[in-house]
Design a protein with these regions (language model features):
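Macrodomain-like recognition of ADP-ribose-binding/processing modules
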Residues: 1-141
Length: 141
């Protein structure tokens, strides 16, 4: 696993990269980077089409196209826990390994409106993906 942090627009990465970001189980996608995913990929509609009414039971990863939606909380106004984020990352890892995906790009997940600490989140990413050969690019602006 290789994790790099780059000052870059997430949506300008090479198409070989699958994207990942955090969402709530109510699929609100009304603010922050989640809103940009909804605008660019009609993500809210796609999530409802594929998963319907989703009930939060812990961290989970819902894949739509080349986007991994990390469900880390029930409602959009709540804050996630590191436990839920870890569960979502572990679920994403299983899917990435199964699908033989080698390149992931994401924002500073959980650290914008969700207010998690990047140092702890980076540590989780490194632990979860340690035994893979996935290239993770973290984009920030």
């Amino acid at each position: 696993m290789r994790l790099t942090e780059v000052e870059k627009d997430l949506f300008s990465v090479d198409p070989q990269y699958s994207l990942a970001h955090c969402i709530s189980a109510d699929f609100a996608l009304g603010a922050g980077i989640a809103k940009q995913f909804d605008t660019r990929f009609n993500m809210r509609y796609e999530l409802f089409e594929k998963y319907g009414s989703y009930h939060f039971t812990g961290g989970k990863c819902l894949k739509i196209g080349s986007v991994f939606n990390l469900v880390t909380k029930d409602k959009c106004w709540q804050k996630p826990t590191y436990k839920a984020l870890r569960e979502a990352l572990e679920d994403m890892k299983k899917q990435v390994v199964t699908l033989k995906i080698k390149h992931l790009a994401m924002p500073l997940i959980g650290c914008g409106l969700d207010k998690l600490e990047w140092d702890r989140v980076r540590e989780l990413l490194e632990k979860v993906f340690a035994d893979t050969d996935v290239d993770i690019m973290v984009c920030y602006r």
